[in-house]
Amino acid sequence: KKRGIDFNATTGLDRTNYFASFPANADTLEWVLKMEADRMVNSNVARKDLDSEMTVVRNELEAGENNPAGVLFQRIRSTAFLWHNYGNTTIGARSDVEGVPIDKLQAFYRQWYQPDNATLVIAGRIDSADVLARVARHFGPLKKPARVLPRFYTTEPAQDGEREVTVRRVGNLRLVAAAYHTPALAHPDSAPLSVLANVLGHTPGGRLHKALVEAKLAAAAGANGESMRDPGLLTAIAVVPNDGDAAKAEAELLKQVEQLATRPITQH
Protein backbone atom coordinates (compact mmCIF):
# COMPACT_ATOMS: atom_id res chain seq x y z
CA LYS A 1 0.00 0.00 0.00
CA LYS A 2 2.88 2.36 0.75
CA ARG A 3 4.01 1.96 -2.84
CA GLY A 4 0.53 2.52 -4.26
CA ILE A 5 0.25 -1.02 -5.61
CA ASP A 6 -3.09 -2.77 -6.05
CA PHE A 7 -2.67 -6.55 -5.92
CA ASN A 8 -5.33 -8.98 -7.03
CA ALA A 9 -5.86 -12.39 -8.62
CA THR A 10 -8.43 -14.32 -10.61
CA THR A 11 -8.98 -18.00 -11.25
CA GLY A 12 -10.43 -19.62 -14.36
CA LEU A 13 -10.92 -23.13 -15.68
CA ASP A 14 -7.62 -22.95 -17.58
CA ARG A 15 -5.41 -20.65 -15.49
CA THR A 16 -4.85 -18.58 -12.38
CA ASN A 17 -3.34 -15.12 -12.68
CA TYR A 18 -1.82 -12.73 -10.17
CA PHE A 19 -1.43 -9.09 -11.07
CA ALA A 20 -0.30 -5.76 -9.70
CA SER A 21 -1.50 -2.35 -10.89
CA PHE A 22 0.54 0.74 -10.04
CA PRO A 23 1.58 4.16 -11.42
CA ALA A 24 4.33 3.86 -14.02
CA ASN A 25 7.50 4.08 -11.97
CA ALA A 26 10.83 2.33 -12.52
CA ASP A 27 11.50 1.79 -8.81
CA THR A 28 8.07 0.27 -8.20
CA LEU A 29 8.39 -1.94 -11.27
CA GLU A 30 11.75 -3.16 -10.00
CA TRP A 31 10.25 -3.97 -6.61
CA VAL A 32 7.28 -5.84 -8.13
CA LEU A 33 9.47 -7.91 -10.45
CA LYS A 34 11.77 -8.83 -7.59
CA MET A 35 8.81 -9.79 -5.42
CA GLU A 36 7.12 -11.86 -8.15
CA ALA A 37 10.32 -13.74 -8.95
CA ASP A 38 10.85 -14.46 -5.27
CA ARG A 39 7.36 -15.74 -4.55
CA MET A 40 7.42 -17.90 -7.65
CA VAL A 41 9.87 -20.24 -5.95
CA ASN A 42 10.10 -19.21 -2.29
CA SER A 43 6.52 -18.70 -1.10
CA ASN A 44 5.83 -19.98 2.39
CA VAL A 45 2.41 -21.60 2.12
CA ALA A 46 1.66 -21.80 5.83
CA ARG A 47 -1.29 -23.16 7.77
CA LYS A 48 -1.79 -19.85 9.57
CA ASP A 49 -2.14 -18.05 6.24
CA LEU A 50 -4.76 -20.53 5.10
CA ASP A 51 -6.68 -20.07 8.34
CA SER A 52 -6.58 -16.28 8.10
CA GLU A 53 -7.88 -16.34 4.51
CA MET A 54 -10.61 -18.91 5.10
CA THR A 55 -13.23 -16.24 5.83
CA VAL A 56 -12.52 -14.60 2.48
CA VAL A 57 -12.77 -17.93 0.68
CA ARG A 58 -16.03 -18.79 2.46
CA ASN A 59 -17.44 -15.43 1.41
CA GLU A 60 -16.55 -16.19 -2.20
CA LEU A 61 -18.18 -19.61 -1.90
CA GLU A 62 -21.36 -18.12 -0.49
CA ALA A 63 -21.44 -15.39 -3.13
CA GLY A 64 -21.33 -18.07 -5.80
CA GLU A 65 -23.96 -20.18 -4.08
CA ASN A 66 -26.28 -17.15 -3.92
CA ASN A 67 -25.87 -16.17 -7.57
CA PRO A 68 -28.80 -17.73 -9.49
CA ALA A 69 -27.23 -17.43 -12.94
CA GLY A 70 -23.91 -18.74 -11.64
CA VAL A 71 -25.58 -21.73 -10.01
CA LEU A 72 -27.51 -22.52 -13.19
CA PHE A 73 -24.41 -22.28 -15.37
CA GLN A 74 -22.51 -24.58 -13.04
CA ARG A 75 -25.30 -27.16 -13.11
CA ILE A 76 -25.26 -26.92 -16.89
CA ARG A 77 -21.49 -27.43 -16.93
CA SER A 78 -21.66 -30.45 -14.65
CA THR A 79 -24.35 -31.90 -16.91
CA ALA A 80 -22.47 -31.17 -20.14
CA PHE A 81 -19.08 -32.45 -18.91
CA LEU A 82 -19.30 -35.85 -17.27
CA TRP A 83 -15.59 -36.69 -17.51
CA HIS A 84 -13.62 -33.53 -18.27
CA ASN A 85 -12.71 -31.26 -15.37
CA TYR A 86 -14.61 -28.38 -16.96
CA GLY A 87 -17.63 -29.88 -15.24
CA ASN A 88 -16.26 -28.82 -11.85
CA THR A 89 -16.13 -25.36 -10.29
CA THR A 90 -12.84 -23.51 -9.98
CA ILE A 91 -13.38 -22.76 -6.30
CA GLY A 92 -14.30 -26.34 -5.43
CA ALA A 93 -16.72 -27.95 -3.05
CA ARG A 94 -17.15 -26.39 0.39
CA SER A 95 -16.02 -29.57 2.16
CA ASP A 96 -12.81 -29.67 0.11
CA VAL A 97 -12.07 -25.98 0.65
CA GLU A 98 -12.61 -26.20 4.39
CA GLY A 99 -10.84 -29.52 4.85
CA VAL A 100 -7.86 -29.41 2.48
CA PRO A 101 -4.59 -30.36 4.25
CA ILE A 102 -1.88 -27.71 4.06
CA ASP A 103 0.59 -30.21 2.59
CA LYS A 104 -1.73 -30.64 -0.40
CA LEU A 105 -1.58 -26.90 -1.10
CA GLN A 106 2.18 -26.84 -0.67
CA ALA A 107 2.58 -29.71 -3.14
CA PHE A 108 0.26 -27.98 -5.61
CA TYR A 109 2.32 -24.80 -5.36
CA ARG A 110 5.58 -26.66 -5.98
CA GLN A 111 4.09 -28.52 -8.93
CA TRP A 112 2.40 -25.71 -10.82
CA TYR A 113 3.56 -22.27 -9.62
CA GLN A 114 6.91 -22.44 -11.36
CA PRO A 115 8.65 -20.33 -14.03
CA ASP A 116 8.35 -22.98 -16.75
CA ASN A 117 4.57 -22.94 -16.34
CA ALA A 118 4.02 -19.18 -16.24
CA THR A 119 3.62 -16.25 -18.62
CA LEU A 120 4.76 -12.80 -17.53
CA VAL A 121 2.81 -9.87 -18.99
CA ILE A 122 3.84 -6.24 -18.50
CA ALA A 123 1.74 -3.44 -19.98
CA GLY A 124 1.66 0.33 -19.72
CA ARG A 125 4.13 3.17 -20.18
CA ILE A 126 7.35 1.21 -20.33
CA ASP A 127 10.69 1.08 -22.08
CA SER A 128 10.82 -2.40 -23.62
CA ALA A 129 14.60 -2.79 -23.52
CA ASP A 130 14.77 -1.65 -19.91
CA VAL A 131 11.92 -3.92 -18.85
CA LEU A 132 13.37 -6.98 -20.59
CA ALA A 133 16.70 -6.37 -18.86
CA ARG A 134 14.97 -6.19 -15.48
CA VAL A 135 13.01 -9.38 -16.20
CA ALA A 136 16.18 -11.21 -17.21
CA ARG A 137 17.92 -10.04 -14.05
CA HIS A 138 15.21 -11.26 -11.70
CA PHE A 139 13.72 -14.25 -13.49
CA GLY A 140 16.74 -15.47 -15.43
CA PRO A 141 18.49 -17.05 -12.41
CA LEU A 142 15.42 -19.12 -11.49
CA LYS A 143 16.17 -22.77 -12.14
CA LYS A 144 13.92 -24.92 -14.24
CA PRO A 145 12.24 -27.45 -11.93
CA ALA A 146 13.32 -31.07 -12.12
CA ARG A 147 9.73 -32.27 -12.10
CA VAL A 148 7.83 -32.92 -15.34
CA LEU A 149 4.35 -31.45 -15.65
CA PRO A 150 1.66 -34.07 -16.23
CA ARG A 151 -0.11 -34.14 -19.57
CA PHE A 152 -3.88 -33.87 -19.40
CA TYR A 153 -5.45 -36.46 -21.65
CA THR A 154 -9.16 -36.59 -20.76
CA THR A 155 -11.37 -35.77 -23.72
CA GLU A 156 -15.09 -35.39 -23.13
CA PRO A 157 -16.88 -38.11 -25.14
CA ALA A 158 -19.37 -37.01 -27.76
CA GLN A 159 -22.73 -36.35 -26.14
CA ASP A 160 -25.18 -39.11 -27.00
CA GLY A 161 -28.44 -37.22 -26.77
CA GLU A 162 -30.03 -34.16 -25.23
CA ARG A 163 -29.47 -33.56 -21.52
CA GLU A 164 -31.62 -31.40 -19.30
CA VAL A 165 -31.18 -30.04 -15.80
CA THR A 166 -33.68 -28.19 -13.61
CA VAL A 167 -32.61 -26.10 -10.61
CA ARG A 168 -35.25 -25.27 -8.02
CA ARG A 169 -34.46 -22.78 -5.26
CA VAL A 170 -36.18 -20.24 -3.08
CA GLY A 171 -36.66 -16.94 -4.92
CA ASN A 172 -38.58 -15.40 -7.77
CA LEU A 173 -35.92 -15.26 -10.50
CA ARG A 174 -36.56 -17.57 -13.44
CA LEU A 175 -33.94 -18.42 -16.04
CA VAL A 176 -33.88 -20.64 -19.10
CA ALA A 177 -30.68 -21.52 -20.92
CA ALA A 178 -29.29 -23.79 -23.60
CA ALA A 179 -25.66 -24.83 -24.03
CA TYR A 180 -23.91 -26.36 -27.00
CA HIS A 181 -20.50 -28.04 -27.13
CA THR A 182 -17.93 -26.01 -29.08
CA PRO A 183 -14.33 -26.67 -30.16
CA ALA A 184 -11.20 -25.51 -28.37
CA LEU A 185 -9.61 -22.08 -28.81
CA ALA A 186 -7.01 -23.34 -31.29
CA HIS A 187 -9.70 -24.70 -33.63
CA PRO A 188 -10.43 -22.58 -36.76
CA ASP A 189 -14.11 -22.40 -35.79
CA SER A 190 -13.42 -20.77 -32.42
CA ALA A 191 -13.28 -17.17 -33.70
CA PRO A 192 -16.41 -17.49 -35.87
CA LEU A 193 -18.27 -18.93 -32.89
CA SER A 194 -17.34 -15.87 -30.83
CA VAL A 195 -18.90 -13.73 -33.55
CA LEU A 196 -21.93 -16.01 -33.57
CA ALA A 197 -22.39 -15.57 -29.82
CA ASN A 198 -22.37 -11.80 -30.32
CA VAL A 199 -24.91 -12.02 -33.14
CA LEU A 200 -27.18 -13.99 -30.84
CA GLY A 201 -26.59 -12.20 -27.58
CA HIS A 202 -25.91 -8.54 -28.37
CA THR A 203 -28.19 -5.96 -26.79
CA PRO A 204 -30.18 -4.47 -28.44
CA GLY A 205 -29.31 -5.78 -31.90
CA GLY A 206 -28.94 -9.50 -31.20
CA ARG A 207 -31.41 -12.10 -32.35
CA LEU A 208 -32.25 -13.22 -28.83
CA HIS A 209 -33.00 -9.69 -27.68
CA LYS A 210 -35.25 -9.02 -30.65
CA ALA A 211 -37.11 -12.33 -30.44
CA LEU A 212 -37.41 -12.58 -26.66
CA VAL A 213 -37.08 -9.18 -25.01
CA GLU A 214 -38.85 -7.09 -27.64
CA ALA A 215 -41.58 -9.73 -27.78
CA LYS A 216 -41.98 -9.50 -23.98
CA LEU A 217 -41.09 -13.17 -23.52
CA ALA A 218 -37.99 -12.27 -21.49
CA ALA A 219 -36.71 -9.36 -19.43
CA ALA A 220 -33.19 -9.92 -20.73
CA ALA A 221 -31.37 -12.33 -23.00
CA GLY A 222 -27.80 -13.00 -24.01
CA ALA A 223 -25.23 -15.50 -25.21
CA ASN A 224 -21.63 -16.32 -24.42
CA GLY A 225 -19.03 -18.33 -26.31
CA GLU A 226 -16.02 -19.74 -24.48
CA SER A 227 -12.43 -19.62 -25.70
CA MET A 228 -10.87 -22.49 -23.80
CA ARG A 229 -7.81 -24.72 -24.05
CA ASP A 230 -10.13 -27.69 -24.53
CA PRO A 231 -13.61 -27.81 -26.09
CA GLY A 232 -16.10 -25.69 -24.15
CA LEU A 233 -19.65 -24.39 -24.45
CA LEU A 234 -21.67 -21.73 -26.21
CA THR A 235 -24.54 -20.78 -23.92
CA ALA A 236 -27.70 -18.78 -24.58
CA ILE A 237 -29.82 -17.54 -21.66
CA ALA A 238 -33.03 -15.64 -21.02
CA VAL A 239 -34.46 -14.06 -17.87
CA VAL A 240 -38.18 -14.81 -17.72
CA PRO A 241 -40.48 -12.22 -16.07
CA ASN A 242 -42.44 -13.33 -13.01
CA ASP A 243 -45.65 -13.19 -15.00
CA GLY A 244 -44.06 -14.68 -18.13
CA ASP A 245 -44.27 -18.13 -19.66
CA ALA A 246 -40.98 -19.99 -19.17
CA ALA A 247 -41.95 -22.71 -21.64
CA LYS A 248 -42.60 -20.17 -24.40
CA ALA A 249 -39.35 -18.37 -23.64
CA GLU A 250 -37.43 -21.64 -23.77
CA ALA A 251 -39.05 -22.63 -27.07
CA GLU A 252 -38.22 -19.28 -28.66
CA LEU A 253 -34.65 -19.34 -27.36
CA LEU A 254 -34.08 -22.79 -28.86
CA LYS A 255 -35.73 -21.71 -32.10
CA GLN A 256 -33.42 -18.72 -32.47
CA VAL A 257 -30.32 -20.83 -31.93
CA GLU A 258 -31.32 -23.80 -34.04
CA GLN A 259 -32.66 -21.84 -37.00
CA LEU A 260 -29.16 -20.46 -37.60
CA ALA A 261 -28.82 -23.44 -39.93
CA THR A 262 -31.63 -22.14 -42.14
CA ARG A 263 -31.34 -18.40 -41.45
CA PRO A 264 -27.66 -17.60 -41.94
CA ILE A 265 -25.95 -14.53 -40.54
CA THR A 266 -25.90 -11.56 -42.92
CA GLN A 267 -23.59 -8.54 -43.14
CA HIS A 268 -26.30 -6.24 -41.77
Regions found by a protein language model. Give the residues of each.
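An aromatic/glycine/proline-enriched structural segment found at the starts
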Residues: 82, 86, 90, 119-184
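Non-catalytic, conformational "gating/processing" segments within enzyme and secreted inhibitor domains
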Residues: 54, 69, 104-138
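M16 family metallopeptidases and their MPP-like homologs
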Residues: 1-38, 69-95, 117-123, 172-184, ...
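Histidine-acidic residue clusters that define the catalytic metal-binding segment
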Residues: 18, 34-35, 60, 78-118, ...
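Short amphipathic alpha-helical coupling segments at ligand-binding clamshell hinges
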Residues: 192, 196, 249-252
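PPIase-associated folding chaperone regions across multiple families
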Residues: 188-195, 213
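Acidic/histidine-enriched alpha-helical segments
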Residues: 1, 44-62, 127, 146-162, ...
